[in-house]
């Protein structure tokens, strides 16, 4: 069932399992039970008026003698496009700006310090169509485009770091397009940008028709609230991608995505959680919601009949911790804001227990990978 027929896995489990069984299933699927945040009543009222879901959970670390808790509140935003994909470009962007502004205002009520939007949040995920116009008209400058200026105002007004994934047009280098996330400091300054390292070529994900693999490596951004990185969408399928952000010091890795139920829903709840465990960090998986219909039919060379939609974006955004615990997911069918209170001390505490960094044998893998990428490499296979 890849459509919107059911709201969430959590609701399904709660509806059908007796409480003792439910508690054991959640223990296995989500790790230790998390405390719900006591978010302001006015935040829930505003979310209800604006028709989006609001959830909040706390990840707590053990009390230490020499270090104070390092508390940061993150916000994850998932949403559907408010206007049809055939509406004028400027109207679609303006409608999305208004929608995000309303959600960010609720995030501010909840004390969010860092907020991240979904992949290519200012547009329909139209890369399935392989058409250039009007979709390339959504591309903007990462440094001073209208969406970056919009986010700078939000960041400064709310003392909030904003992670804004957009379709970037790089006018300094031949007007090339990139799938980019802009990181804006809570001061309102553009802290930097990062680009999608892995580009899918599967099913209707025809993204390489528009942009290629990123060229900025694995930057980590030092913010007032902690060190963050952005692993965009398809990069979550690549363990080494997560690893390099972690090696560069990321304490929180955001994964803004646009992925559909028929392809990846069975993988979704596992990948970011596994990355949090393997890399001793927090991970934040974000997915858009709904079905987007395009004016013209398209195909992708996979034998399927021509169609006008990509498939169902199933939301289900969640946060996972280095100890393997995770929040429930947001709805599969509704816009939402997930607020998570993180104690970053948990990263080091879990590291001290499991020692994955110490036992990682990176020098061995670096040596073997350096050999494996050579054209004359021969795999080590022992035969009789």
Curated annotation (Swiss-Prot):
Its EC number is 3.5.1.6. It comes from the Eukaryota. One of its GO terms (molecular function) is beta-ureidopropionase activity. Homodimer, homotetramer, homooctamer; can also form higher homooligomers. The keyword Cell inner membrane does not apply. Belongs to the carbon-nitrogen hydrolase superfamily. BUP family. One of its GO terms (cellular component) is cytoplasm. It catalyses: 3-(carbamoylamino)propanoate + H2O + 2 H(+) = beta-alanine + NH4(+) + CO2; 3-(carbamoylamino)-2-methylpropanoate + H2O + 2 H(+) = (R)-3-amino-2-methylpropanoate + NH4(+) + CO2. This is Beta-ureidopropionase. Keywords: Cytoplasm, Hydrolase, Phosphoprotein. The gene is UPB1. Signal peptide: none annotated. GO terms for biological process: beta-alanine biosynthetic process via 3-ureidopropionate; protein homooligomerization; pyrimidine nucleoside catabolic process. The keyword Cytoplasm applies. InterPro entries: Aliph_Amidase/BUP, C-N_Hydrolase, C-N_Hydrolase_sf. It is an enzyme of class 3 (hydrolase). The active site is at 119 (proton acceptor), 196 (proton donor), 233 (nucleophile). Catalyzes a late step in pyrimidine degradation. Converts N-carbamoyl-beta-alanine (3-ureidopropanoate) into beta-alanine, ammonia and carbon dioxide. Likewise, converts N-carbamoyl-beta-aminoisobutyrate (3-ureidoisobutyrate) into beta-aminoisobutyrate, ammonia and carbon dioxide.
């Amino acid at each position: 069932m890849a459509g919107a027929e059911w709201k969430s896995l959590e609701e399904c489990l709660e509806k059908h399992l007796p409480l003792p069984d439910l508690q054991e299933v959640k223990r296995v699927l989500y790790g230790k039970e998390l405390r719900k945040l006591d978010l302001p009543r006015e935040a829930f009222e505003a979310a209800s008026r604006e028709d989006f879901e609001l959830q909040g959970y706390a990840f707590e670390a053990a009390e230490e003698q020499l270090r104070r808790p390092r508390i940061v509140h993150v916000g994850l935003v998932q949403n559907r496009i408010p206007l049809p994909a055939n509406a004028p470009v400027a109207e679609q962007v303006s409608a999305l700006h208004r929608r995000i502004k309303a959600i960010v205002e609720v995030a501010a009520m909840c004390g969010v310090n860092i907020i991240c939007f979904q992949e290519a949040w200012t547009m329909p995920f139209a890369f399935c169509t392989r058409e250039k116009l009007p979709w390339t008209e959504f591309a903007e400058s990462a440094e001073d485009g209208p969406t970056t200026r919009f986010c700078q105002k939000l960041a400064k007004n709310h003392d909030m770091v904003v992670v804004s994934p957009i379709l970037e047009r790089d006018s300094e280098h031949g007007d090339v397009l990139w799938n980019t996330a802009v990181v804006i400091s809570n001061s309102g300054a553009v802290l930097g940008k990062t680009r999608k390292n892995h580009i899918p070529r599967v099913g209707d994900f025809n993204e390489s028709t528009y942009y290629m693999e990123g060229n900025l490596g694995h930057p980590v951004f030092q913010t007032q609230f902690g060190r963050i990185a952005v692993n965009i969408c398809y990069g979550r399928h690549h363990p080494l991608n997560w690893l390099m952000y972690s090696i560069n010091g990321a304490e929180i890795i955001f994964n803004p995505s646009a992925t559909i139920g028929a392809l990846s829903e069975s993988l979704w709840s596992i990948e970011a959680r596994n990355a949090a465990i393997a890399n001793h960090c927090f991970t934040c998986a974000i997915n858009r919601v709904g079905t987007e219909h395009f004016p013209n039919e398209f195909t992708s060379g996979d034998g399927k009949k021509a169609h006008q939609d990509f498939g169902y974006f199933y939301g289900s955004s969640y946060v996972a911790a280095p100890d393997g615990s995770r929040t429930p997911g947001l709805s599969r069918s509704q816009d939402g804001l997930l607020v998570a209170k993180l104690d970053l001390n948990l990263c080091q505490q879990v590291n001290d227990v499991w020692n994955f960094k110490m036992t990682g044998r990176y020098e061995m893998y670096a040596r073997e990978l350096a050999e494996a990428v050579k054209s004359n490499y021969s795999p080590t296979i022992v035969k009789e």
